[in-house]
Amino acid sequence: GAWPTQELSPQVIVNCADTASGCHGGDMLSAYRMMKEMGVPEEGCMRYTATDNECTDFNICRDCGHDTPCHAVQNFTKYYVEEYGYVTGEEKMMKEIYARGPITCAIAVPDDFLAYKEGVYRDKTGVTTLEHAISVVGWGETEDGEKYWIGRNSWGNYWGENGWFRIVVGKNDLGITGSCNWGVPIIDFSCVCYLSNRRTQMSSLCCLL
């Protein structure tokens, strides 16, 4: 299969969204507000470093040559959202993903989720403190008929299923249906997203994660 190829820079959001509090959590809506007012470049402009940096030209888009020091890039493409909002509940989440693209949701993070490797995750802790943001891009169903959300995390490709995860639908595990946000991109991209050998419903805008 093929995963989305158009990826924006989460590090710029960490650096520049005023009330997102960078790596210390915060308000997801402020990230969408920043994307509407300021725009976000492609990930190649500023790779994810999991650190809080000042919102300067150097920390928005930079270029590093083999024989020259890193320097800020002045001319680069930014991507914007035209509107954004709040959504909760499984049915409304699915309608939003189907109609307009991936959504961002806050979740709890118990130890066994940190150690997640593969398969459909089921929470056994009952923890409900929302402290981490992930993207929900679609949903699917196992051969045994178990429904699950398809989520993308920000902990690198070595975590989970190549940086992605599946979590059971219908139980609100990790509080995944309780606090989600959506954003509508201004530019309409076209991309193909699918998971081989699985029944899935994926958004055509998954490339904007």
Language model: regions and residue ranges:
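Catalytic-core signature of thiol
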Residues: 1-209
